[in-house]
Amino acid sequence: RGLGDVYKRQQIPLYYQYKSTGRPTALGGWCAKYIDIPTEPAYPFGYGLSYTTFNYGDITLDRTSMPMDGSLTAKVILTNTGSRDGAEVVQLYIRDKVAESTRPVKELKGFQKVFLKAGESREITFKITPDLLKYYNYELQYVAEPGAFDLMIGTDSQHVKTATFVLH
């Protein structure tokens, strides 16, 4: 087998700022407003290279409202659109849109490594339970709060498809 015949794909577990300092040089004055200066990562969390390409279909939810003692299923069709066989790490992120305390914009809650032959498609399924939505509040109680959530599935933290559901 040649080098290009063997499929290799690795994901990075962190992201790199586009500029190594995270902020531009202050010309003609001193600047310490790092938080106000927009920077995009050069490589987002979960980014990886591949010898092939993949396409994600839209997310379908079996319901858009989930009770505290229930669950819901999120599905997406993944297609290998390239000319080579390959593996893809399908990543699940969840965002709590309104919470008692500040929550991450995207929180990795699951992933699946899927191998597809060139041209092959497969339905990828994630089961969402209230346990995936829990966090420690200010009183150190492990809780899932009712409200709206964004569910994101994609190839890395920036290239995702989004669906919304409500926990009640």
Residue ranges and their predicted role:
Residues 53, 58, 110-113, 132, ...:
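Extracellular/lumenal ectodomain signal focusing on beta-strand-rich modules
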Residues 100-136:
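Intrinsically disordered, low-complexity Pro/Gly/Ser/Thr-rich segments with frequent PxxP/GP/PP motifs
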Residues 68, 118, 145-146:
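Surface-exposed loops/turns
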